């Protein structure tokens, strides 16, 4: 049990250093859950947590359509502009990478710590913004596969 505590505290601390509130909150919640009856939820989160997260993210992204904030004419104007077409292409690439990221995180969950550390370095020293872990994992998956690692 000691190593789980150390890993969760490490993730929490590096997330705080990197100002990644979502990862810090997740680390803190998992730490609290570890010492409560909620630890019974861990198998479910391991098995279905990524799908649940993607569902919530998808609901968030599609809500403007359901609320009537984005109209069909908005979609058409997006497809007629160069910036809109680049955005569509970027969405396709990001979705492709995310698919590979999900598979990598399922098969090799230990890479999450590397993604967090990389995000902190990029945000702290390269004036970047921490990327979504699934897209970052997708990029890592493509590189790992390309390098046969």
From Swiss-Prot:
The chain crosses the membrane at residues 5-25, 52-72, 85-105, 111-131. It comes from the Bacteria. It holds the Pfam family DUF441. It is a multi-pass membrane protein. InterPro entries: UPF0756_TM. It is found in: Cell membrane. Keywords: Cell membrane, Membrane, Transmembrane, Transmembrane helix. One of its GO terms (cellular component) is plasma membrane. Belongs to the UPF0756 family. HAMAP family: UPF0756. This is UPF0756 membrane protein Nther_1957.
């Amino acid at each position: 049990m000691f190593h789980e505590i150390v890993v969760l505290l490490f993730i929490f601390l590096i997330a705080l250093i990197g100002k990644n509130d979502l990862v810090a909150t997740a680390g803190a919640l998992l730490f609290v859950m570890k010492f409560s009856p909620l630890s019974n939820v861990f198998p479910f989160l391991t098995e279905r947590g990524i799908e649940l997260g993607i569902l919530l993210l998808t609901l968030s992204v599609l809500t403007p359509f359901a609320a009537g904030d984005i109209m069909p004419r908005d979609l058409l104007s997006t497809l007629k502009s160069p910036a809109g077409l680049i955005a569509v292409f970027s969405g396709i690439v990001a979705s492709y990478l995310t698919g590979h990221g999900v598979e990598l995180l399922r098969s090799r969950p230990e890479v999450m710590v590397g993604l967090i550390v990389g995000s902190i370095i990029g945000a702290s020293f390269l004036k970047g913004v921490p990327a979504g872990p699934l897209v970052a994992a997708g990029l890592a998956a493509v590189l790992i596969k390309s390098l046969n690692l």
